[in-house]
Every structure is written in C-alpha cells, then in structure tokens.
Amino acid sequence: MVRSLGGAGRGSDRLKAWVPTLCLGLVVVLTLAYTIAGAIVRPNMYSDSGWGFVGWYTQARASAFNYSLGPDLSDISREVEAFMSTWTPGQHVLPGLVEKLGMNLGLAIIVVVAAFSVLGLFGWHALYQAFGFPPPTIWVALAVIVCNRFFNLSFTNYSGGESLLFGVAPWFILMVWRLREFRWFSVIPFVLGTAVLVFAKLSGMIFGAAVVGGAAICGDRAWAKWDTLRKLVVAGIAIALMGAIFYFTWYTRGVTAASIPTTLHPDGLLFYVSLGVTCLWSASLSLLDLGHYLFLNPGRQVLKSIDAVVYAFFPLAVATFTVTWIRLRHDYGEYLRFVFATCGAILVVFLATWMAAKSVSFDERHFRIPALLLFIGVVHAFITSQSWILRLCFAAVVGLACLYGVTSFVTRTIANSHYPMGDRGFRQMNATAEAIAYIRTIDLAGPDARKTLIFLPSPEIALEVRNARNWSNLADFDSLEDLKAMAYRGRIDRLYVFVQKKLLGNGKADAILRSFVDYPIDGWTMVPLGDMVCFYQIRN
C-alpha cells in the first residue's frame, strides 16, 4: 500500500513536470495554426478598422499625419480633411506599412496580428514570472489564453487595436513593475510607454495611468510609510504629464467614444458596477462573448439584452476574486495589492464615463488587459487548491471557454472562405462578389477619378476603391432617423451609391438617396448586384 501511494505521488510529480512542456506545445501549435489558416483564407475586417484604413489611404493627399480626406457636406465636389481622433493610428498604420513592402493588405494584417500575438505571449510570460508565479501556473495560463476567442479573433476578423494592445501592454506593465521604487527618472519611461499604449489603442491612456498609480501603493504597509508619499508624487507627475499630452494632442482635436453622448442604462450604477466587475472576471476567457453567442444570436435570440447574463456572472466574479485573495494574500500580497488597485482605478474611470452618459460600449474587451493581470492569480489560486470542488469548477469554466474559443475560430474561418475576396486581399463580409466586380468597372484611373464619388454602406467596402473618391456610412446600423437627418449638398460628375438590398424595403435606401439633396429622386438608375444594389447618376 505504501509503495502504491508513493508510486502515485511520483506519477503525479512527473505529470506536473510535464505540464509546462505540454502547454508550450499547445501554445506553439495553436498559434501556428491560427497564422497559417489566416494567411491561407485571409481575414475580414470590422468597420472600426475600416474607417482607419479609409483615412490611411487618403493621407498622401492630406496636410499632416493622421488626417484623412472626405467629401465636404456643403459641396460633395470638394474634399475636406479632419483629424482621425476616433480610431487609434496603430491599427491601420502598422498593416499599412507592411503592405508597402509588397504584400496585400489581408496578408499584412495576418503578419501584424501574428507578430503582436507572439510578442504578447512573451510579454505575459515575462510579467507573470516577475510576479513570482511558478512555471506550471504560467504555462497553464498561457495555454488557456491561446485557446480563447479573444486571442484568435483578429486572425479571422481584424479588430485593430485589440491585438496591438495585447502585444505591448505586458511589457509596459513589466517596466512599471521593475521601476516601482519610483525614482524621479521613472517619469520619462512611464510617459513614453503610455504613448506606445495609446498608439496601439486609445484606452491605453487609462491603462497606463492606472498601472502607474497601482504600482505606487502596492508595497507592504504602504499606507504607513513616508516613502509612499514620494512615490505618489512621482506617479502623480507622470500621470499628469500623460493626461496633459493626451488631452492637448489628441482628445481636443476631434470626437472620441468618451465624448459622444448617449443614454443611461435604466438600472444606472447597479448595472454599470455589475458589468465592470463581471468584465474583469470574464474578459480573460471571453465569457460574455460566449453569453452573446448563446443568448443573443440573431438566428435564435433567447434574451433581449445581455443584462441577465451580467447579473448572473457578477456573484461568480466576486466569489472568484474572494477565493483568489484569500489563497494568495500571504505569498503574493504585493501582486494582489498592485492588481486590485490597478483594476479598481480602471473600473472607476469606466463607471464615471458610463454614468456621464458617454458612448463607450459595454464590451468586455475594454477590460481585457486588467482581466489578464488578474487571471494568473486566479489560475494559481484554483489549480493549487486542495479542494477538488474548486479545481473542478475551474476546469469546467476554462474548458468551456477554450472549447468555445477554438471551435469559434474554425467556424469563422469556414465562414470567411465563403465571403468574396476583395482587391486588397481580405474578405468582404458585407459586400457581394457582384458589387466588388462592379466597383472595379467604375473605379477608373485618370483625370475623371477625382470627379467620381462612390458611396458605400460600410467603410471596409470602401477599401475596394483605389482611384475614385469614396465615402461610406453604416447604413445597416444607423437608425432611419439619423439617415434622414443627413444632407449632402452639391453635385459631382459621377455619383454611385451602394446599399444592401434589404434596405430597399425599410426606408433606409430611400433616406440615403434623398440625403443627396441636389439630386432629383427620380433621376437614379438602379443596378442589381446580388444582395446589394447600386444607384447612380451621371452628369452628361
């Protein structure tokens, strides 16, 4: 009996010794699989990224970096330029620069996504190691991350700054962690590092300030030490510089999500607190995304909103964080204080933004980076627990998230293979093959290109236009009232307006055509293009 128990113990030890190797193999295999599949099939693109690329391709004619050209609403024959304040520059600048090396945009996107995914994996490994977690815990966490939907999403659906922030954020956090003595020279790398975060994604400003503030107060008995005051002064100077630079060089120069008004949620602060805490728990596993898939899928919608899922997840999040704090408070106290202070600061900023009725969405992706900070602690607390109930609960939730992540990648890849390939080498999810082919027949080079305006129902479709001027809206998502409120004045020699066929019956197509107020409504010629149609008027 003793020999049997001893053998079992040695077998368990051997299994633990193999965990890092097995997880490393899974990380490498899946990352390569995502990259190869993305390079072969090519990704599609979300509209936010599409807007950025629309601006990127007009910058050669603009007066300065990050300015884009679009039609003058008072006279569409003219162009006006505007600072692109809504979208982070990194999401289109980096793939755009890679494209200039000679490859098409679709492949350039995969190169950038793969590079920042690998950079992020190395960064999170280094950061988790700096926190003092053992290799088995680190590799389990990384294997789970790679299996998740958020990690593989941009290999099929390019989401811009999310991948970039995943790649650079851990290195910034590691730098702050290494410099948490807060010598005066630390201000410069803190500010420069935050600038890199902002280049990757605008919310990097929030993360940078929160991480610096959290590191200033995470020391043992920090509240009882005078040195904490010095650290807070250094942190305050760094954060003030970050904020001032961001405010004057970016925020005041145009519209951002934090400056667009919207309506408050009916439940107010109760919902916002529940959502924020839930996202800090769910974002590392894409669990709210899973909730959307299960309960809000347009083809089989079960719930009217995600609210019920948020309220159901909230107690699970609180319980998870409580268990993590109790189990790690003795051996990882500084890590816990740093992470909870950082997450608390980020949560407060988002609560203030939501309560101010600003149009920051309710997506869990906004909390991905702080959630990944918490995730390594959660993994260690649960997989090292003596309680089989805790280990089983962890395995069940993580297993479900990983299954969803990998299968959703396969599903999205298959779906992409059926979308038409665009001229720039990425898949067009919202355009028909007939529409893409027709654009190529009307997008002619030469002196008449500047006298042609092609208006499209989503910005990523506008990237099919290489010569003529182009513009777009979000016809499928804009309300009918908003479309009716638009007015484009003036005339141009050739005007083409593309809309989805389904908009012909709900009044949106008519509203878009009537928004060109100097064109007679009975003067349009319609060309059917599969599930899309094109209306045009050409001046003789």
Regions found by a protein language model. Give the residues of each.
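Membrane-interface helix-loop-helix junctions at transmembrane boundaries of multi-pass membrane enzymes
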Residues: 130-132, 136, 183-184, 219-233, ...
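Transmembrane-helix motifs of polytopic, lipid-linked glycan transferases
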Residues: 111-132, 171, 326-327
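Extracytoplasmic loop-helix module adjacent to an early transmembrane segment
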Residues: 34-85, 95-100
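Signature aromatic-anchored transmembrane alpha helix within multi-pass, membrane-resident enzymes
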Residues: 24, 28, 192, 212-213, ...
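Membrane-embedded, lumen/periplasm-facing catalytic core of multi-pass transferases
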Residues: 397-462
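Hydrophobic/aromatic-rich transmembrane helices and adjacent perimembrane loops
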Residues: 162, 168, 200, 206, ...
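Transmembrane-helix signature of polytopic, membrane-embedded enzymes
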Residues: 107, 124-148, 166-167
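Membrane-lumen/periplasm interface segments of specific transmembrane helices
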Residues: 228-319
